[in-house]
Amino acid sequence: MTLTRRIIPCLDIKDGRVVKGTNFLGLRDAGDPVELACRYNEQGADEVVFLDITASRENRGMIIDVIQRAADELFLPLTVGGGIRTLDDVQKTLRAGADKVSINTSAVQNPALISEAAQAFGTQCVVVAIDVKRRTSPEPGKTMIPLPDQSSCWYEVVTHGGSQPTGIDAIAWAKEAENRGAGEILLTSMETDGTKEGFDIPITSAISESVGIPVIASGGVGTFDHFYEGFVYGKADAALAASVFHYGEMTIADVKDYLSKKGIAIRPHTQ
């Protein structure tokens, strides 16, 4: 797909504040998403994702304020996800200054939202986030994928932050999302998320090979080499990470230098 691979930090935001801790030195306010996003911008991020995990609809206005401030200060694409349930939500988010919206549970519950958003605002604005879990028992119509230990499994789409099974095959859903107008897939494996043991390569490569739109790998980064594996073996077009960047374990500039030396085409980091 894309010629250059992208590195994308993700910020979880609740009531307008970043909820995962950071240890960046020199930040006036480690809880301010715009300040953090600007720091990532300086480090050479290709995009930034804001994931709004605000529980109540009443506080949704706070993310709009954050988006507006970020759009004024950032010079890189901004994707916003979380709580986007209707076409009106999509419109408000884009009007506030987001370049793309990420829809997850709402897309599974109402697949027409993908088509409606793509038709209204363009496929380039629509990212369908897919959370998956491994299932080892074969079922009719499910795509079994070989695993490194010689076993195999199929991957089920899960919603509501990974808590709700759907019975939907991940590869079939990715294809449907593309057919309905998704411009990108943001794939997170619940098997690897938070483990720092690397991306879930089997499903990342399977979906990357099954669709013609970019796939963003998410969940499990712990080392520089995990980014490399996601691109080379997972065939992902972009890699998303959170904690390794937030806690200062590595910088985006360092990741890009490493990948460049390994022959991966990336957008050069410029101060």
UniProtKB/Swiss-Prot annotation:
Active site annotation, chain numbering: 12, 131
Molecular-function GO term, any one: imidazoleglycerol-phosphate synthase activity
Coiled-coil residue windows: none
SUPFAM superfamilies named in the record: Ribulose-phoshate binding barrel (SSF51366)
Keyword annotations from UniProtKB, A to Z: Amino-acid biosynthesis, Cytoplasm, Histidine biosynthesis, Lyase
One Pfam family of this chain: His_biosynth
InterPro entries on file: Aldolase_TIM, His_biosynth, HisF, IGPS_HisA/HisF, RibuloseP-bd_barrel
Role played: IGPS catalyzes the conversion of PRFAR and glutamine to IGP, AICAR and glutamate. The HisF subunit catalyzes the cyclization activity that produces IGP and AICAR from PRFAR using the ammonia provided by the HisH subunit.
Name assigned to this protein: Imidazole glycerol phosphate synthase subunit HisF
